[in-house]
């Protein structure tokens, strides 16, 4: 339902020759089920939702004469405190980064959608903003957290040059035929298939390679094991002295797929390595290694409404906890955002309708406290 909704907003999902939405394999998936836009699905969803906001503002402009009468976007803004009144959230206090000017929002309901905490690790795929600030604000206000000990390290982040260490190398590379090799040129993942996965994953290169063209009659290549298994295997190879020059391993797709295939299926990865590392992935392997990627923990929420234990406070996306267990499957973060973001929004509206639209007033002394 949410994928269809995103298409009505303008998202351009890849299609099969039969006209159906294309679905690809990611690590840990038993079946290909990830709807995608090349290798840049997340960027396409951001573009689509930004475009939808602009469209709604244009509609408001026609209806009221004010494009910001319904939706107002505050860019480059940092929240530093949630405002509370009688045990219920009543807004937020923050500042504009460009000017340093302080200001406050009052609201009958607040949704925390501030993402994760990956930037607390030295090597991470996350942006500089992912420092867990939203979680800290909610915890100070009295919200409870869950599963904070579970942080996923994606197995493939860039290793060189130092300025881009940790930048994500999408799992799509392995889903489309890329394999992991150590410094000896060996596909080492066959040595790291846990007993629990033996019946599902190939034990020879020949069978693993056949899976790409005949998945119904062959076992999956071990490069597509769940992310924690692949990250541990890479770390073991590096510790055993079989790593790449900069402390990772090699991800090779150039020797296995044509240049046309790679540039068509993985355009973002091709340009990312060409521009940031001067590596042509159609001709040479990529250096990759584990990178801090996703926090499974977050605010404890009701699974149907995304409500926290604080009246009027809701949470969605990576800032919420409990949905992904201890190890999220690849692709499920975007599914999480689309499904539970909608639930959080609907529940916040229902809360306000039930408890009233009136927002509390805060004095200057309260804001400065």
Kindly label every feature range from the protein language model:
Residues 2-101, 113, 157-161, 166, ...:
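Conserved redox-cofactor binding core of oxidoreductases
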Residues 12, 177-190, 291, 297-307:
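Active-site and channel-lining beta-strand-loop segments
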Residues 70-75, 80-90, 95, 264-320:
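A glycine-rich dinucleotide-binding beta-alpha-beta segment and adjacent secondary-structure elements
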Residues 98, 107-109, 113-118, 277, ...:
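Glycine-/small-residue-rich beta->alpha transition segments that form the dinucleotide
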Residues 98-109, 308-312:
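Core beta-strand elements of the Rossmann-like FAD/NAD(P) dinucleotide-binding domain
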Residues 109-167, 199, 327-347:
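Glycine-rich loop(s) and the adjacent beta-strand/alpha-helix scaffold that form part
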Residues 144-275, 347-353:
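An anion/pyrophosphate-binding glycine-rich loop and adjacent beta-alpha core
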Residues 351-369:
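Long, amphipathic alpha-helical stalk/connector segments used for oligomerization, subunit docking
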């Amino acid at each position: 339902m949410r994928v269809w909704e995103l298409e009505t907003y303008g998202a351009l999902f890849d299609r099969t020759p039969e006209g159906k939405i294309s679905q690809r394999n990611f690590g840990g998936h038993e079946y290909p089920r990830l709807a995608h836009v090349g290798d840049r699905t997340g960027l396409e969803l951001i573009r689509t939702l930004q475009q939808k906001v602009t469209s709604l503002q244009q509609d408001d402009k026609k209806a009221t004469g004010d494009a910001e009468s319904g939706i107002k976007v505050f860019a480059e803004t940092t929240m530093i405190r949630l405002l509370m009144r009688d045990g219920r959230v009543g807004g937020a206090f923050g500042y504009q980064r460009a000017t340093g000017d302080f200001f406050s929002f009052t609201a009958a309901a607040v949704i925390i959608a501030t993402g994760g905490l990956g930037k607390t690790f030295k090597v991470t795929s996350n942006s500089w903003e992912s420092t867990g600030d939203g979680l800290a604000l909610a915890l100070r206000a009295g919200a409870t957290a869950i599963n904070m000990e579970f942080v996923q390290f994606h197995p493939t982040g860039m290793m060189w040059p130092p300025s881009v260490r940790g930048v994500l190398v999408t799992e799509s590379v392995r889903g489309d035929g890329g394999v992991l090799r150590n410094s000896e040129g060996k596909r080492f993942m066959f040595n790291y298939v846990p007993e629990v996965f033996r019946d599902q994953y190939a034990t020879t290169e020949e069978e693993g390679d056949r899976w790409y063209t005949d998945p119904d009659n062959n076992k999956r290549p071990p490069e597509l094991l769940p992310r924690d298994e692949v990250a541990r295997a890479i770390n073991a190879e590096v510790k055993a002295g079989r790593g790449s020059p900069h402390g990772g391993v090699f991800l090779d797709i150039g020797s296995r797929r044509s240049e046309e295939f790679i540039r068509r299926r993985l355009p973002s990865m091709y340009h990312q390595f060409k521009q940031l590392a001067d590596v042509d992935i159609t001709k040479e392997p990529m250096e990759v290694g584990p990178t801090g990627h996703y926090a499974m923990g977050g605010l404890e929420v009701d699974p149907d409404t995304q409500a926290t234990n604080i009246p009027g406070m809701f949470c969605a996306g990576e800032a919420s906890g409990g949905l992904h267990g201890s190890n999220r499957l690849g692709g499920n973060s975007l599914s999480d955002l689309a499904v539970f973001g909608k639930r959080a929004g609907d529940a916040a509206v229902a809360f306000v309708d039930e408890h009233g639209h009136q927002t509390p007033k805060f004095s200057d002394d309260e804001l400065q406290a």
